[in-house]
């Protein structure tokens, strides 16, 4: 025990007594302690008052204005209710539990709470309390009468046990839902709803819709209790946020939510569809999901994938169809639980804020469904069946769930909602591949039922082989049938006829065959699938028997017969060797699919850029033609180069890798005798020139010497065809080489030698004398040709 220097203690004095303490110091400490306590009280009072002030301020911001409902709806869609202390009230307003008129809130709340109290009193009964007032011939524990309270009590007990079984599994990672009072609230609310809706009763998954509602109500009640410690809240707050009526308020919100979600839990078919099915024959080549019962939830998820997903991402839609992943596999849980298992609870509440704020019909569910698929689309497209199933059944974590809501809003109405920032998903596909494999293994084990003993299977296969081979052997014996026996007796005679030296070797061989069978995993599968009929026949041919066509009358030994049977089984061992090869092929196919998706994106981008460039180039071209500019010709030449780029992006003009190399080593050569040496002017005076200025607007003049402007700055396109074909006048698609020549009206079109000639470095000197026909991207031609440009200002 530590003592300060101011204290003195007698060795024989007990530790409980304290002596030698200065009374002044104790007084000062006491007075200082009192002052500290007063300071703490003052600070705590200020903190509590500040808490209530902020609480009341938030109440006024949300509910004290004329258009408060639109305000809280916008906050719910924008994700601004995440930290709100009045989220439960907002949900009640979104789901029409509370009226928009605030003056009716108290009366409406009291009415709903009295309604639930009456329901609970009717359905949750104890027959022991009312047994004295009823006929004991009917109301006894052994009575099976429908009007018996005891019979009803046992039926209710069975229903409650089923509900409690699901309630115990509700959010097991959260301590709040493991409390007994919370579990009792969940059970009572679900039981009362089931008894009030006998046509639907209780369906698995309803507890996961009720649990977030109870959690939000509890959080708001705790915030109310904390804020009301320092100040007196209003009567409106006291009534709406009374913690004693948490169960009553939860039932009111849950029952209103189920008004919309009830068809998703119903297993009844549509009445209108039943009449159609009696008249319609099954659809040929229909998918399995289209041939099932027309349940509302199945119709909904099929419509989401077949219409919405197909509209927004046809590639992902085709990939899921190719893998035969029906939307019912994952979509039923997504829609029924309102994505309750796909997000953490705090993110789930943000999603529900947007769903409820959007409207009571929950129309945003369909687009959140599609947005979730688009979020992981790259991972899905590049994955096989197992990995896709793992991704869909165990949805990956999303860092910003609000971006998913914005994506859904954009998909529904892109005109009113801006395009959200692309939020990419970088998955660990190995994890989801393992999860998908686990799901497949679980489904297989559930379908198989009890596991089989491999020893029993091997023994049964051995006996099965004996029965198959032995009856076919007896009729072929040389000595005819055995006297006094049939085929079955002959098999019994053949088996024991072994020498003493033959028995141990056969026993060892039999053990080896059993071990080989145990290692062969595919044999039972082949037998189940009916593939064994290819290898095993009930009436084997002569070639399949030992010895082939040289079969003699002496029957073979038992070991030889078993070898003929197990030789077919041993072939299945090669099946396991090909599994690794198939896995590598699947991974390669996944990579090819992913690269194909990227190529499609690049192709779409190039086409879009070409389309936009074409539009802007035409506009620039029209403006230039209307203005008289000094360097108009240079601008037009630059436009022609841009149009070549546009045609390359569009795909109508072929792009060669040599062009990149030529650009790196680009050199401009000048030849004074270019036109004379190239021979381009020989025999091409007629029908081979097109005016550039006329070709920009239209092919109005095909006469070689005619020009629209008639000056020395006109551009003339000389075609390199030998057949004298007329030039095409659409400048918007012009991609063939250009030549600028000086032309005068009324004169021959013989080319004029220029002192300044630019030779194309891409084509080389041989391009001038080439006779290859020119290409036009409008004709989808992809041939390349050289060109020479002469500036009209330098001529």
UniProtKB/Swiss-Prot annotation:
Residues 81-359 form the Rab-GAP TBC domain. It is found in: Endosome membrane; Cytoplasmic vesicle, Autophagosome. The modification Phosphothreonine is found at residue 42. A motif (LIR 1) lies at residues 57-62. Pfam families: RabGAP-TBC (PF00566). Residues 786-791 are annotated as: Required for interaction with ATG8 family proteins. The record marks 204 as: Glutamine finger. GO terms for molecular function: AP-2 adaptor complex binding; GTPase activator activity; protein-containing complex binding; retromer complex binding. GO terms for biological process: autophagy; macroautophagy; positive regulation of receptor internalization; protein transport; response to starvation; retrograde transport, endosome to Golgi. Residues 25-49, 523-542, 554-564, 727-748 have a biased composition (Polar residues). Its main location: membrane. Residues 484-496, 765-776 have a biased composition (Low complexity). SUPFAM superfamilies: Ypt/Rab-GAP domain of gyp1p (SSF47923). The record marks 169 as: Arginine finger. The arginine and glutamine fingers are critical for the GTPase-activating mechanism, they pull out Rab's 'switch 2' glutamine and insert in Rab's active site. Interacts with MAP1LC3A, MAP1LC3B, MAP1LC3C, GABARAP, GABARAPL1, GABARAPL2. Interacts with VPS29 and VPS35; indicative for an association with retromer CSC subcomplex. MAP1LC3A and VPS29 compete for binding to TBC1D5. Interacts with AP2M1; indicative for an association with the AP2 complex. Interacts with ULK1 and ATG13 (phosphorylated); indicative for an association with the activated ULK1-ATG13-FIP200 complex. Interacts with ATG9A; the interactions seems to be restricted to the AP2-clathrin-associated fraction of ATG9A. This is TBC1 domain family member 5. It comes from Homo sapiens. The gene is TBC1D5.
């Amino acid at each position: 025990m530590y003592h300060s220097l101011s204290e003195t203690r007698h060795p024989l004095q007990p530790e409980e007594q304290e002596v030698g303490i200065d009374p002044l110091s104790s007084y000062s400490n006491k007075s200082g302690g009192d002052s500290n306590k007063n300071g703490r009280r003052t600070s705590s009072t200020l903190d509590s008052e500040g808490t209530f002030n902020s609480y009341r301020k938030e109440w006024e911001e949300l509910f004290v204005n004329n258009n408060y409902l639109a305000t809280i709806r916008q906050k719910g869609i924008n994700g601004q209710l995440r930290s709100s202390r009045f989220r439960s009230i907002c949900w009640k307003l979104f789901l029409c539990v509370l009226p928009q008129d605030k003056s009716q809130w108290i009366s409406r709340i009291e009415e709903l709470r009295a309604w639930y109290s009456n329901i609970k009193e009717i359905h949750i009964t104890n027959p022991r309390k009312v047994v004295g007032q009823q006929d004991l011939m009917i109301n006894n524990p052994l009575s099976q009468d429908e009007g018996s309270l005891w019979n009803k009590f046992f039926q209710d007990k069975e229903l409650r046990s089923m509900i409690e079984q699901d309630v115990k599994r509700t959010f097991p990672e959260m301590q709040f839902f493991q409390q007994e009072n919370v579990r009792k609230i969940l059970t009572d609310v679900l039981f009362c709803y089931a008894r009030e809706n006998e046509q639907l009763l209780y369906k698995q998954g309803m507890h996961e819709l009720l649990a977030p509602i109870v959690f939000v109500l509890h959080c708001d009640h705790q915030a109310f209790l904390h804020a009301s410690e320092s100040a007196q809240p209003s009567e409106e707050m006291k009534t709406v946020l009374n913690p004693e009526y948490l169960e009553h308020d939860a039932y009111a919100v849950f029952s209103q939510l189920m008004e919309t979600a009830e068809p998703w839990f119903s297993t009844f078919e549509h009445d209108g569809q039943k009449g159609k099915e009696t008249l319609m024959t099954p659809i040929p080549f229909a998918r399995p999901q289209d041939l099932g019962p027309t349940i509302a939830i199945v119709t909904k998820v099929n419509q989401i994938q077949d219409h919405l997903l197909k509209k927004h991402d046809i590639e992902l839609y085709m990939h899921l169809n190719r893998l035969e992943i029906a939307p019912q596999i994952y979509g039923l849980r997504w829609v029924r639980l309102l994505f309750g298992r796909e997000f953490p609870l705090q993110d789930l509440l943000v999603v529900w804020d947007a769903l409820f704020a959007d409207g009571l019909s929950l129309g945003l569910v369909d687009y959140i469904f599609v947005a979730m698929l688009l979020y992981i689309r790259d991972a899905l497209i590049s994955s096989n069946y197992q990995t896709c199933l793992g991704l869909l059944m165990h949805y990956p974590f999303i860092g910003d769930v609000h971006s998913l809501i914005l994506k859904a809003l954009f998909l529904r109405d892109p005109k009113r909602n801006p395009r959200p920032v692309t939020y990419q998903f970088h998955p660990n596909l190995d994890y989801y591949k393992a999860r998908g494999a686990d799901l497949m293994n679980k489904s297989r084990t559930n379908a198989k039922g009890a596991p089989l003993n491999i020893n029993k299977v091997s023994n049964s296969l051995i006996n099965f082989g004996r029965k198959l081979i032995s009856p076919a052997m007896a009729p072929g014996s040389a000595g005819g049938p055995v006297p006094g026996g049939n085929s079955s007796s002959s098999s019994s005679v053949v088996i024991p006829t072994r020498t003493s030296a033959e028995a141990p070797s056969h026993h060892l061989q039999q053990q080896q065959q059993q071990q080989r069978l145990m290692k062969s995993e595919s044999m039972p599968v082949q037998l189940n699938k009916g593939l064994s009929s290819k290898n095993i026949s009930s009436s084997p041919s002569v070639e399949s028997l030992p010895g082939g066509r040289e079969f003699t009358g002496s029957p073979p030994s038992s070991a030889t017969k078993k070898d003929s049977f197990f030789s077919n089984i041993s072939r299945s061992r090669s099946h396991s060797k090909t599994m690794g090869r198939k896995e590598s092929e699947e991974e390669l196919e996944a990579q090819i699919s992913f690269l194909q998706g990227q190529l499609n994106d690049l192709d779409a981008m190039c086409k879009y850029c070409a389309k936009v460039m074409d539009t802007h180039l035409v506009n620039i071209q029209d403006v230039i033609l209307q203005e008289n500019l000094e360097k108009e010709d240079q601008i037009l030449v630059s436009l022609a180069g841009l149009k070549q780029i546009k045609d390359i992006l569009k795909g109508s003009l072929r792009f060669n890798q040599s062009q990149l190399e030529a650009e790196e080593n680009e050199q401009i050569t000048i030849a004074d005798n270019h036109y004379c040496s190239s021979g381009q002017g020989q025999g091409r005076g007629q029908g081979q020139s097109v005016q550039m200025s006329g070709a920009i607007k239209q092919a109005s003049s095909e006469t070689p010497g005619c020009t629209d402007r008639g000056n020395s700055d006109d551009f003339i396109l000389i075609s390199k065809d030998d057949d004298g074909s007329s030039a095409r006048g659409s400048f918007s698609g012009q991609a063939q080489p250009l030549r600028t020549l000086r032309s005068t009206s009324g004169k021959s079109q013989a080319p004029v030698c220029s002192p300044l000639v630019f030779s194309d470095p891409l084509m080389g000197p041989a391009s001038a004398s080439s006779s290859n026909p020119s290409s036009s991207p409008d004709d989808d031609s992809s041939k390349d040709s050289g060109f020479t440009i002469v500036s009209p200002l330098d001529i």
